[in-house]
């Protein structure tokens, strides 16, 4: 009938049996020869042929794992339901089953169908569940390569290994330092100071300079700094026409992509010049500023320091240029002093993440 299996011992005696009840659930019994009774098995896993069965506290089979197929089924009202994008306990460990219903074989972070973020080993076993609300992520064939998670007042940024690469206290004060027109020979000096104080900044680069300073851009990206788009040749975009605008943006995006494997998600128009045509054509948020240091004009480190430190407020976007030695010199004071004042130095995108976000075509001077 296909509704009963028996296990026979060495002497031909039946030592266990598994049979399907009237409600469609398998039940497992073992014969106790001491008391000469069949004992229903409860809260136990049993391997039968190429499957593992779990019998709950009532003795009903509620889970079946197919060993060779690496698939798991929940049993409800006698029906087998394939587990997809979810975690299930198999014996003593928890395992993750992907979108195809198979136990995964690639280590990494996964997002379950119910929105839980987990990290699993190469055998599919769950190492840990990562707390918080997943707000944004990138993935490759179901494995997350990065993600942003809100956990209480904290914003965490995870890498592909499930490790926190950045954490920001959303309840704390923060500002975004931005540097335009580079990279240059002075950009590395600024990165040195940022690294020393565990801080980041946003570098709005010119596409025509990217290949010459590829190592600097890679280093900035690896530090967690943001690479923004500042057009290819510092072209004033207002009045340039859609095709010219898009060429300036796309060529820069391609240059950056070639170096770090990802494109900028924000841009700054040269001189801040923009109109509706520019906003529509660039296809990214436009980032202006709330503090203009005019470092390009003064070429004076003290003036640049004062422009920042005497006017800074929570949520500011600060404009500087990494083309000048005086700006690098000023940064050696500005960065530690802002940290001492209690500011978190974040990228533009991080600032936006913590203060309501930004959209393509939107224009932003600060995030309060």
List where the protein language model places each region.
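Active-site-proximal beta-strand/loop segments in catalytic clefts of secreted hydrolases
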Residues: 179-181, 204-208, 231-232, 268-272, ...
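Residue-level preference for the first positions of well-ordered beta-strands
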Residues: 175, 315-317
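Alpha-helical scaffold elements lining the catalytic groove of polysaccharide deacetylases
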Residues: 219, 235-262, 271-314, 327-333
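Extracellular adhesion/carbohydrate-binding repeat motifs centered on closely spaced tryptophans
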Residues: 1-171
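Residue-level detector of anion-binding/catalytic polar loops
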Residues: 200, 226, 285, 292, ...
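C-terminal domain-boundary segment and adjacent tail
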Residues: 196-197, 210-211, 326-368
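Active-site beta->alpha N-cap acidic-glycine motif
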Residues: 163-240, 244-251, 255-258, 262-263, ...
């Amino acid at each position: 009938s296909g509704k009963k299996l028996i296990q026979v011992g060495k002497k031909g005696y039946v030592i266990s049996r598994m049979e399907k009840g009237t409600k469609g659930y398998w039940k497992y019994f073992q014969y106790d020869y001491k008391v000469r009774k069949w004992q229903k098995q409860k809260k136990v896993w049993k391997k039968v042929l190429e499957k593992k069965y779990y019998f709950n506290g009532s003795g009903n089979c509620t889970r079946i794992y197919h060993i060779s197929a690496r698939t798991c089924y929940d049993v409800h009202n006698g029906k087998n339901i394939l587990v997809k994008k979810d975690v299930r306990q198999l014996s003593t460990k928890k395992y993750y089953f992907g979108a195809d219903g198979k136990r995964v074989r690639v280590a990494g972070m996964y997002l379950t169908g119910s929105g839980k973020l987990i990290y699993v080993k190469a055998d599919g076993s769950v190492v840990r569940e990562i707390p918080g609300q997943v707000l944004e992520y990138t993935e490759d064939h179901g494995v997350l390569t990065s993600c942003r998670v809100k956990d209480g007042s904290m914003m965490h940024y995870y890498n592909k290994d499930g490790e926190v690469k950045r954490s920001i206290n959303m309840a704390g004060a923060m500002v975004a330092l931005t540097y335009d027109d580079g990279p240059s020979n002075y950009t590395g000096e600024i990165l040195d100071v940022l690294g020393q104080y565990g801080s980041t900044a946003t570098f709005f680069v010119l596409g025509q300079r990217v290949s010459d300073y590829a190592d600097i851009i890679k280093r900035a990206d690896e530090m967690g700094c943001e690479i923004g788009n500042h057009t290819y040749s510092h072209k004033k975009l207002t009045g340039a026409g859609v095709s010219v605008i898009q060429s300036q943006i796309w060529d820069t995006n391609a240059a950056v992509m070639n170096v770090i494997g990802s494109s900028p998600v924000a841009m700054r128009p040269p001189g801040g010049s923009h109109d509706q045509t520019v906003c529509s054509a660039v296809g990214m948020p436009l980032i202006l500023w709330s503090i203009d240091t005019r470092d390009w004009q003064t070429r004076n480190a003290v003036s640049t320091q004062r422009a920042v430190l005497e006017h800074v407020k929570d949520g500011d976007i600060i404009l500087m240029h990494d083309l000048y030695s005086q700006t690098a010199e000023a940064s050696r004071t500005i960065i530690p002093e802002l940290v001492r004042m209690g500011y978190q130095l974040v990228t533009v995108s991080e600032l936006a993440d913590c203060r309501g976000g930004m959209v393509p075509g939107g224009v932003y001077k600060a995030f309060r």
